[in-house]
Each structure stands twice: as structure tokens, then as C-alpha cells.
Amino acid sequence: VDHLAPDLAADLTKVTAWMSRQGLGEGPIDDIREITGGTQNIMIRFGQDGPDGRRDLVLRRGPRHLRPISNTVILRETRVLRALADTDVPHAPLVAVCEDTSVLGDAVFYLMEPVEGFNAGAGLPALHASDPAVRHEMGLSMADAAARLGAVDHVAVGLADFGKPEGFLERQVPRWLSELDSYSKFDNYPGPDIGGVDAVATWLRHHQPASFSPGIMHGDYHAANVMFSPTGPDVVAIVDWEMSTIGDPLQDLGWMLATWYSPGREPVLPNELMTVGGLATPDELIERYARNSNRDLSQIDWYAVLACFKLGIILEGSQARAAAGKAPREIGDILHISAVRLFDRAQSIMAGSVTGGER
């Protein structure tokens, strides 16, 4: 553990002692490395040679400076992973959970099996970078995985109380307009310099689907929140379940469409996969989802616009925090550009839903 930061090394020592007490493994650990990603949550991969052979594990806990909800979010993730154990949804298998904060002093944590794959948000291996046919299938595999998640009976897998689906769609516009308004509390933030906020909100209210079938939602379903096979296009795991809940699973498909490559437009999120070409079109993604789902996709444009609206407001929060000195200015500026592009895309989809143009 020498190459880890001292606090993480101390955490790992406590975790391995806990594993021994729980009968989860004995002996020294090796091949230790921190896994970095788009989240502040801490993940450390390590291996252990025990009496039953070699085992590799991943430790996941909240960030160094825990927020009030950090432990709750981590434990919610474990509920989802446990619920998915006997489904065909690609995910990292859960091994063990520690809800006792005294083990680490402040944080709950869990152990999962590692997934052999790569995150497209961190770059593409040679195979995927060089073969457009592989990249084309990557998006279709993402649509497959989203459809499988949306098809899970959340009540049957123990998640009946995991969210509040009643009134879920009605809550979205006021919830996120309220979030945008809350940014005014940040010093030196002049307000959102984003076109179309009111127009998009009004359109969403007027075109809201009349009903939906509740299910498990990932909540942040884009190409950097899945792991792809290193040897092909398949999604081997959906990761980062921090925003998961019970709601309308079609929001995950909408989120994917909102953040996907669009011909002639700048990428919404910085991601190499979105810039190299050869990707499936939005219509192909919808068609593949439909092949694996019984859900009504006739209003999928609404879900894509909602995703643009919601994600745009979330990203603008970094601009507001940057204005107050609570986030790096360069990050705030980059994410503000993404927010503007998302609202531009929302208005293009709104026009296209009437004229048959761009999604």
C-alpha cells in the first residue's frame, strides 16, 4: 500500500482487517491501485491470495470529505447491485457491504468484483479507435443494456421502496427549475446565460406523457458511465449508480440520446467516443432499445428534451460554484458550454418532433 495516499492506505488496512473478521479473506494483499473516474467516490482495486485461491476485489466508499448524503448514496448503490444479481443487466457483482461507520471512522463501504473493461470517457483502446464497425455496435450495446435495466421488475427484486414513482414526470420541471433558481445563492453568479430555459420548460409541461410504467432508472446514463469489453463492443457493466431511483426508465434512453453524437454538432460532453465517428445514429439506438423492450417509445423525444433540460441545469451548477470560488473556473466554463449546447439540442429536438427533423 506504500504508493497509495496515507489516508487511503490506512483505509485499506482497516478494510482487510474487517474482511478477516468477517471470514471474507485472509493474508496479505497486493496489486493495489486506485481507480479514478468521473466521481469523487474512492475506489481501490486489490488482490489477495487466500486458502480458496486468488481473488481480486474493488473497494468503493464515499469521497474523502463526506457530504451529508455520501453514506446514504453508497448504501443505495449496494441495494441496486444486490437487486441486479440474478438479472441480465451488466453490472459489477456485489461481494460484501459494511454499514458500520466505526470500521473506517466515518464512511460505509462495499466490496465488488472487478470488471475487465474500459471507460470510454478515459479514451479508446486501439481496436475500438481503429474500427468503426466496433464503435457502431458500442452504442447499440448501450441501448441493449438500458432496455434490460428498464425491463427488470423492481418490486420482484426488492426495490419497491427505492423511489417515489407516483408523480415522477410531473415533478421534473419544477424540481429542476427550483435547482436552477437555487444557484442565485452563490456569490458573483449573475444568473444562467443560457438560451431557451423557459421555452424548454413550457414545452415539457405541454407535451408530458400521460402515463408511464415505473422501473429502475440509472439516472445518469451516458457513455462514460458504462464499461466496455476490451475485446469487442459489448457493455460489460453499467457503473456509477449514484443517481439511481425508481422512476421512468425511458429517461435513461433519453439521457443517452441527449449526450450522444449528433451530426454537425459539437459533442455535449468531452468524450473521445463522441468525436471519432462511426457511431450508431439516434434512430438506430431507439430501434435497438425497442427490440428489447415493451415500452411505448412514441414520445421518446420528450425524454430526450427532459434529459437536456435536467443535465444542462446540473452542469450549470458548476458555473455558479466557480463564480463563488467553490469550483475551478476552467471546469465551470467548460460545463457551462455543455449546458448551452444541451439547451440548443433540446430546442432542435423540440422542432424536430414537429417537423420530422433532428432528434
Model-identified regions with their sequence ranges:
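Active-site activation/catalytic loop segments of kinase-like enzymes and analogous catalytic loops
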Residues: 251-293, 307-326
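ATP-binding pocket architecture of kinase catalytic cores
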Residues: 32-216, 230-232
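All-alpha amphipathic helical-bundle segments outside canonical DNA-binding/catalytic cores
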Residues: 164, 295-307
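Catalytic-loop of the protein kinase fold
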Residues: 216-218, 223
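Helical subdomain adjoining the active site within ATP-dependent kinase catalytic cores
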Residues: 295, 299, 313-359
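Juxta-kinase regulatory segment immediately upstream of eukaryotic protein kinase catalytic domains
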Residues: 1-25
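Hydrophobic residue at the +6 position relative to the catalytic HRD Asp in the kinase catalytic loop
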Residues: 226-228
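Activation of the activation-loop gatekeeper triad in protein kinase-fold domains
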Residues: 239-244
